[in-house]
Structure formats: structure tokens, C-alpha cells
Amino acid sequence: MSIAIIDYGSGNLHSAAKAFERAARSLEDPQKVFVTSDPDQAYGADRLVLPGVGAFADCRRGLDAVNGMVEAITEAVRVKARPMFGICVGMQLFATRGKEHVITQGLNWIGGDVEKITPRDESLKIPHMGWNTLDVLREHPVLNKLPLGPKGQHAYFVHSYHLNAANEADVLARADYGGPVTAIVAKDTAIGTQFHPEKSQRFGLALISNFLRWKP
């Protein structure tokens, strides 16, 4: 089994790779983790990870600049039904559009727009940086046995925008930051988190481990 972390010039590749390697070691079946900017290698992997930090438009341009990568991951996920994990802006790229400064087309795997978060409490700063618990909207195998809810473990967020999904069924969990913030989305074999699981300590590691066990 192999896990490809997509390198398109954005994302905490080293941190993500280390987190997935650590989670993979906890499984009964060995899984190889590798970072790649080669579309053929990405397409050939059993699971894919799309990290991302920075502005939506910059990340989309970076992904488009890797010749054949959008086509490869779209074929792998949407046609071959291989599991994909999006992290932060990597998850946002699943959306129909991003509205950060300019309108930018996303991958359109999950209907909806990436919009600026607008806390009701004006004292809450943007970007949203820090630890939050998650409120689960629906069950999913990747959330199995995780300590969620108001008394659950915390996830680490650093962002100013979130995915406002068109279909409520595509949202697995939200956080509260002066109002609801989309935290986890999933549709078919694609799942993504607005927070950084690689920085979320034991909770993040458990979430990644569940993703690696998931057989959609």
C-alpha cells in the first residue's frame, strides 16, 4: 500500500509526511508514504494527500502548474475511487470556487464556495489561530472512536476562510469561532479538514490512522 503526498509548491510537506509515516507505522499492514510532484506516481498510489497553505488562488495556480496533476488526482479520486485527504487549503480546493480576493475555480468535488469567516464577536481576530473542539454533524468511518464534541480533544486551526458547502450532508463537523466554521468535509472517497491534523497531536494522529484504515 502506498500514500502519495502531493507536492505542488504549497503545504507543510515535511510535517504532513512525518505525521502520515507515524500513523502508517501503527497499522498492521505496512504503508509506504512518499512526497511526489509526478502525476503518474500520484495516480498510481493507493491513497492521496493534498496539503495546502496560503491563498486559495495561489494554491490553485501551483496545482495547475504541475503538468497533468489535476487530471491525475481527479481520475484517481473521482473515477478510480481512491481515498484522498485534503488538509487546510488542500481541502478548500475540493470546493466549486474560492472567493479569497478573486473568484478562482476549485476542483468542484464538493459543491460550495470558500468564503471568509465572519465571527459575530468583533473581538475575535482573523485569521483564526488556535485550538478548537469539533461538533460532529454525522458519523463517518474516519471519525470512528475519536473523542469529539464539547468535551473532546482539540484540533489546531490557522485560517481566514472556510468551505461553505452547498449540501449540508457533505459537512461532517464544525468548530465554533463566533459562529459555525466548517471543520471536516467528505464526499465519496474525498475527505478534508480545515484544521491541521499533522499539528493536532494525538487527535490528529488518530484521525490520520482512521483515514489509512478507511475502505470506502
From Swiss-Prot:
Main location: cytoplasm
One BP term from GO: L-histidine biosynthetic process
GO molecular function terms noted in the UniProt entry: glutaminase activity; imidazoleglycerol-phosphate synthase activity; lyase activity
Active-site residues from the entry: 88, 196, 198
Reaction equations catalysed: 5-[(5-phospho-1-deoxy-D-ribulos-1-ylimino)methylamino]-1-(5-phospho-beta-D-ribosyl)imidazole-4-carboxamide + L-glutamine = D-erythro-1-(imidazol-4-yl)glycerol 3-phosphate + 5-amino-1-(5-phospho-beta-D-ribosyl)imidazole-4-carboxamide + L-glutamate + H(+); L-glutamine + H2O = L-glutamate + NH4(+)
GO cellular component labels: cytoplasm
E.C. numbers: 4.3.2.10, 3.5.1.2
SUPFAM superfamilies per the UniProt record, alphabetical: Class I glutamine amidotransferase-like
Annotated pathway: Amino-acid biosynthesis; L-histidine biosynthesis; L-histidine from 5-phospho-alpha-D-ribose 1-diphosphate: step 5/9
Keyword annotations of the record: Amino-acid biosynthesis, Cytoplasm, Glutamine amidotransferase, Histidine biosynthesis, Hydrolase, Lyase
Compartmental location: Cytoplasm
Chain ranges of the Glutamine amidotransferase type-1 domain: 2-216
Superkingdom: Bacteria
Free-text function comment from the UniProt entry: IGPS catalyzes the conversion of PRFAR and glutamine to IGP, AICAR and glutamate. The HisH subunit catalyzes the hydrolysis of glutamine to glutamate and ammonia as part of the synthesis of IGP and AICAR. The resulting ammonia molecule is channeled to the active site of HisF.
Subunit field text: Heterodimer of HisH and HisF.
Protein name stated in the entry: Imidazole glycerol phosphate synthase subunit HisH
Organism field: Bradyrhizobium diazoefficiens (strain JCM 10833 / BCRC 13528 / IAM 13628 / NBRC 14792 / USDA 110)
Gene encoding the protein: hisH
